[in-house]
């Protein structure tokens, strides 16, 4: 028995090529009901850039357990949550913790894009970006826009 090699020009390869990147509006279809305040497309891009800079400086907290631990320790930063995480019980307590401690938080549409921005191949449902002087200007710009978003109902 021999293995059959996949045709690189076959229909499956073409389907993968056309569907590799999903647009912002396509990602909005999968949002949770609690994903408020939601970042605009422009703010989402700025947050991804800020996250990439923070990863280089190792000023990032990734994952529910780690982020929750450092919120309880009193660390400050911008909380970025993925709006397409299911089940929502995994991280629905984090916005309440942020509001109690006056930490800014925002939802973005995709956990896979959030994980990729953090330099991981795995999807990530929550990231905390801490301030650092190397990317302070980008951080302050994101912080200002996140704080200007309307509060959730």
From Swiss-Prot:
Top-rank taxon of the source lineage equals Eukaryota
A biological process term (GO) from this entry: rRNA pseudouridine synthesis
What GO cellular component is one of the record's annotations? Cajal body
**Glycyl lysine isopeptide (Lys-Gly) (interchain with G-Cter in SUMO2) crosslink location in chain:** 3, 5
Glycyl lysine isopeptide (Lys-Gly) (interchain with G-Cter in SUMO1) cross-link: located at 5
Query: What is the first-listed, main subcellular location in coarse terms?
Result: nucleus
The question of whether Nucleus is a record keyword is answered with yes
The GO terms describing molecular function are: box H/ACA snoRNA binding; telomerase RNA binding
Where does it reside? Nucleus, Nucleolus; Nucleus, Cajal body
Mind listing the UniProt keywords for this protein, alphabetically?
Answer: Isopeptide bond, Nucleus, Ribonucleoprotein, Ribosome biogenesis, RNA-binding, rRNA processing, Ubl conjugation
SUPFAM superfamilies in the cross-refs: L30e-like (SSF55315)
Q: Where is this cross-link: Glycyl lysine isopeptide (Lys-Gly) (interchain with G-Cter in SUMO)?
A: 5
Tell me the PANTHER family matching this sequence.
RIBOSOMAL PROTEIN L7AE FAMILY MEMBER
Q: Main role?
A: Required for ribosome biogenesis and telomere maintenance. Part of the H/ACA small nucleolar ribonucleoprotein (H/ACA snoRNP) complex, which catalyzes pseudouridylation of rRNA. This involves the isomerization of uridine such that the ribose is subsequently attached to C5, instead of the normal N1. Each rRNA can contain up to 100 pseudouridine ('psi') residues, which may serve to stabilize the conformation of rRNAs. May also be required for correct processing or intranuclear trafficking of TERC, the RNA component of the telomerase reverse transcriptase (TERT) holoenzyme.
Self-association state and partner proteins as the record states: Part of the H/ACA small nucleolar ribonucleoprotein (H/ACA snoRNP) complex, which contains NHP2/NOLA2, GAR1/NOLA1, NOP10/NOLA3, and DKC1/NOLA4, which is presumed to be the catalytic subunit. The complex contains a stable core formed by binding of one or two NOP10-DKC1 heterodimers to NHP2; GAR1 subsequently binds to this core via DKC1. The complex binds a box H/ACA small nucleolar RNA (snoRNA), which may target the specific site of modification within the RNA substrate. During assembly, the complex contains NAF1 instead of GAR1/NOLA1.
State the family named in the UniProt similarity comment for this chain. Belongs to the eukaryotic ribosomal protein eL8 family.
- The name on file for this protein is H/ACA ribonucleoprotein complex subunit 2
Question: What's the source species for this entry?
Answer: Bos taurus (Bovine)
């Amino acid at each position: 028995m021999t293995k059959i090699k996949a045709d690189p020009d076959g229909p499956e390869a073409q389907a993968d090529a056309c569907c590799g990147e999903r647009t912002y509006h396509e990602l909005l279809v999968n949002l949770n009901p609690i994903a408020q305040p939601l970042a605009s497309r422009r703010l989402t891009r700025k947050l991804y850039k800020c996250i990439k800079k923070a990863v280089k400086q190792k000023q990032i907290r990734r994952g529910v357990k780690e982020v929750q631990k450092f919120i309880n320790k009193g660390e400050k930063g911008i909380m970025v949550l993925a709006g397409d995480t299911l089940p929502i019980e995994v991280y629905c307590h984090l916005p309440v913790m942020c509001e109690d401690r006056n930490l800014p938080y925002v939802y973005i549409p995709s956990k896979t894009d959030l994980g990729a921005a953090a330099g991981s191949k795995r999807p990530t449902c929550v990231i905390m970006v801490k301030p650092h002087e190397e990317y302070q200007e980008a951080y302050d710009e994101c912080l200002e826009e996140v704080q200007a978003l309307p509060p959730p109902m």
